[in-house]
Amino acid sequence: EPFCISYHGVSRANVKEGDKVLVVGAGTIGVLAAIAAKAKGATVYISDVSEGKLEMAKEFGVDGTLLNDSPEHFDKGVAELTEGNGFDVTIEAVGLPSTFQNCIDACCFGGRMVLIGVGKKNLDFNFTLIQKKELNVFGSRNALKKDFLELIDLVHAGKAPLEKIITNVYPFEDAAKAFADFANNPGDMLKVVFDFSGINK
């Protein structure tokens, strides 16, 4: 289900072979969006504030990473990765005003930008850049039946290493510890699975 959310967003942005894509946010949804974009033939980079998350993202075949530790470093990295042109597609997978602005700044003229991250704060951003750059901005939530069907084919074709997404397995009796660990996630946890095999029926 999380993969379908990411895949639907990538499809909304019409990611295709030859596109240069930047995913902003290397959590579960962001990493899955990167996998989906790679499967569609794009060159994919992923950005995050956490070096640990970026190291983990490399295991999923992204073409490069960009540490977003300051606006200056982010902008410089985008310019270097795109020869100053910007990315064809930017994917917002965090839901913060700052990462929304990152996606606007990193997108090329006439580029596509899709919002997957769910925000809780009102946005305060430079909307004139959307006009000046003639950006195409897409919202995305959940998924469609066709997304599930296409993903089944993708998994069967071996283009989606989903087994790597499950980074931690806890016995059910350790559920409280699992939630505490995830709340303090240093960046090396993506999806957590509970093992119910030890429960007496």
Residue ranges and their predicted role:
Residues E1-P71:
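Mid-domain Rossmann-like dinucleotide-binding core that forms the NAD(H)/NADP(H) cofactor-binding site
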Residues K38, Q131, H156:
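Anion (oxyanion) recognition and catalysis
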Residues N136, N142-A143:
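Glycine-rich phosphate/pyrophosphate-binding beta-alpha loops
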Residues L22, A26, I46-S47, L66-L67, ...:
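Glycine- and other small-residue-rich loops at beta-strand/loop junctions that grip anionic moieties
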Residues Q101-D105, K145-K201:
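C-terminal hydrophobic helical "lid"/dimerization subdomain
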Residues S50, G119, A143:
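Residues in the short beta-alpha loop(s) of Rossmann-like NAD(P)-binding domains
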Residues A13-N14, E55, F60-N136, I199-K201:
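Glycine-rich cofactor phosphate-binding loops and adjacent beta1-alpha1 units
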